[in-house]
Amino acid sequence: MPMKMGWRWYGEGNDPITLNDIKQIPGVTSIVWALHNKMPGEIWEIDEIQKVADQIHAYGFDMDVVESVNVHDDIKIGLPTRDQYIENYKQCIRNLSKFGVKVICYNFMPIFDWTRTDLFHPVGDGSTALFYEKDKIKGDYKAMAEYIMSFTEKYNMTFPGWEPERMAKLDELFKAYAPVTKEKLWENLKYFLEALMPTCRECDIKMAIHMDDPPWDIFGLPRLLVDEPSIEIGRASCRERV
């Protein structure tokens, strides 16, 4: 099967790159998208999806990959309330399938999504790049959150996984995750996927989990997908449509 080229787009008002800009890139036929205004656990409603679909289709793009439908922390922690959030996730899958979505990306990282210690690290040619320095993660998690959030305010955009609503609850989240071991996190991932698989089969949608980014424990939080053996554990846990 030939590789299909897609381009991630963060949506109107949240991405300086427009769909018209992306249209100029040779070979790109699909937009990797999401509803970035939705918090984890919320249902993506048909009319909300339709609005983005109209924008994407106006430029002749497909929209068959979503990144991401984020997973609520109650599911990752394994709280009794997780079942309702799983039902909401199933409804997201059903609604997205009506628009031709075939792949849903997600992650199972506790509290933080992707983490970098420098968003504008200078490189030799004068450009800048994202950068991660492991020793800086040994400090205060609040300092890291404040650093990332400073760019949210400066550029008037929201970084996925670093939404202000989540950052306001950091202390509360760290307390909730305190008893969650790596083994328990694996169990909770398995529970989540096994609950979703019948709906995924019904809707012909595959779930694509993102590797932990970076692939090391941070601030004492467990991480699952960090190397090749961990990927095999994930496959063994739930082989269908993953």
Where are these regions (language model features)?
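Hydrophobic faces of well-ordered beta-strands that scaffold small-molecule active sites
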Residues: M3-R8, T29-W33, M63-E67, I104-Y106, ...
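Surface-exposed, active-site-proximal loop segments in enzymatic domains
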Residues: P40-G41, N70-E87, F112-G126, L170-V180
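Glycine-rich anion/phosphate-binding loops
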Residues: E42-E48, G78-N95, L185-F192
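Glycine-rich, aromatic-flanked loop segments that form ligand/cofactor-binding clefts
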Residues: A53-D64, S97, V101-R166
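Acidic/histidine-rich catalytic cores of soluble enzymes
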Residues: K138-R241
